[in-house]
Amino acid sequence: MNQTILKTMIAEWLEEFALPALIPRDAAPVPADLRNLSEILAIVGPRRAGKTFVMYQMIAGLIEQGFAGRDDILFLDFEDYRLRDFAPEDMETLFSAFRQLTGKDPAWLFFDEIHQIPAWSRVIRSLHNRGRYRIVISGSNARLLLPDIATELRGRYRDHLILPFSFKETLRWHDISWTERTFYTAAKGDLLRIFDTFLKTGGFPEVLKKDSPGERRQLLQNYYQTIFYRDIVERYNIRAKSLMEGMMTCCLHQFSSLFSLSAFEKGLKSQRQPGSKRTLANYLAYLQEAFFILCADKFSYSPRQRVMNPKKIFLIDPGFIALTEDFSENKGRILENVVAIELYRRRQTFNYYKNRRECDFIVRDAESVNLQAIQVCWTLTTGNRERELRGLLAAMEELSLPQGLILTYDEEESLPAAPSRQIAVMPVWKWLLG
């Protein structure tokens, strides 16, 4: 690759680039943890969720606390069009260009969207093996969260998940502070106002900057199209674009609902359209890997049962729901989707429960030892109270859980469910701030 291009980009970073004003992210690693970084640190999450700004936050912290100077750091965005032809063998040319401009090797490597490089894991492993660099990478592919990536990097790897703003971070964006006392004062109205907007707009940082619903919707539509074309069609060389688009559209409209590959395949056959179940399973995996959807399996101790049953689909950000039907028709499902995202953010494993009754979430901790049953609805009414309670109780009884949780828009109470069983009702917004 042309070294002049690399020198230009390095010089832009060293001399011209000003770190932007930042909204601190809760999930960002702190400088003290980075100072003696010995592993490869991967910042992973959806496109446009703020991964680059998290890297900026890390760099700013290192510089402000005196752990590094600007010329100790090499930052490069591999989605820059000037790097479209960058190959693994160009890495030495890159370091040579840096040395010519600074007189030394970089101590820190910040490589944004690293998965754009062919055989990137081999390249990063080779750099790490030299023992000269502290390495931070980012990527918009959920495969970077999978164990096989850690295996490829010989276990010298840990990931850090960055999603669009949480509700807590959205309050920070709007410069609204809160304490537990706020929940019981008139200032609670400000929290609910922002929460209402959060349910309709989501947490993509650039979307929050837009003033009108039309501008926000257009930007979300652009994100949707970019995920489809760049993160799925181009990355996986999809030939049956209409089939892939049909599945993505189906998932968009079926958020917080069950999705059956068998039923989808039958629908294709009835319309005389091609699409094997294996192909559909691959396409569903691509949507997950592109951070467009989350999938929850049916709760079962049998791996076969988990695989054979339909999956429950959730969108990675509630803002995408604005591309579908009217908000008022989907309020309960939107709350459920928001809960799923937060569980994923907290790196908790969750399934749905479905027997004769239904419960929205069975949540497991990291060791899969402690279980929690959670039901989600917009409000408890005379029409749905019995159904929601019976579904939650069925899960609690089968799994021997003494406590259950119902999350609603803004209700709070404690329900004596049965002997030795207790059910708490709590507002979703308060749970999100916990």
Mark where each language-model region is.
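Accessory nucleic acid-recognition modules appended to NTPase machines
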Residues: 3, 72, 212-370
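Hydrophobic anchor at the beta1->P-loop junction of P-loop NTPases
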Residues: 43
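Conserved lysine of the Walker
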Residues: 51
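Short glycine-rich substrate-engagement loop in P-loop NTPases that contacts/grips substrate
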Residues: 75-104
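Interdomain motor-coupling "hinge/lid" segment immediately C-terminal to the ATP-binding subdomain
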Residues: 2-7, 147-257
